[in-house]
C-alpha cells in the first residue's frame, strides 16, 4: 500500500489529504490550534483514527501518539549535534542511534536530512519505506507500506517527525 501526502505551507491549522497510489483520499489530517502542534487523522467518513500531539513545557520537542483515545507512545527529540536524534517510546519502541527504532521488532533507519526512512521487522522483513520527493514547493512524502494494518502508525510516525522538523525550521 502506498500513501502520498503533500504538506502545505502553514498547514498546522489547516487540513490536507493523504492519498493512495491511485489518487484516492484515504486519510484526512487536520491541524488544530492549541499549545503546541496537534494533528488529528481521520478516515474519509470523518471518524477520528489517531492524534499526534506536541507536549509543551519540555526542553526539547516531544510528541504523543494516540490511536482513537488510546495512548500509543511518544517521540522525543534528543540533544545532539549535526544529526537529529529521537527517542521513540511506543509499544516497546526504542531508538538506537540517530534513526534506529525498535517497536515490536520493527526497526527504522533514516538519512541525515530526514528525507528517507526504511522500517523493517524483527525477522528483517520490510514494514515500510518512507521517502521525500525534493523537487516540490512543499514537503511531499511517499509511504510505501507492506501491510496496510500498519498504515496509521507509520503515518503518525512521519507526521510527528515532520512536525518536529517544521518547529525546528521556524525557530
Where do the PLM segments sit?
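Intrinsically disordered, low-complexity proline/glycine-rich segments
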Residues: 1-171
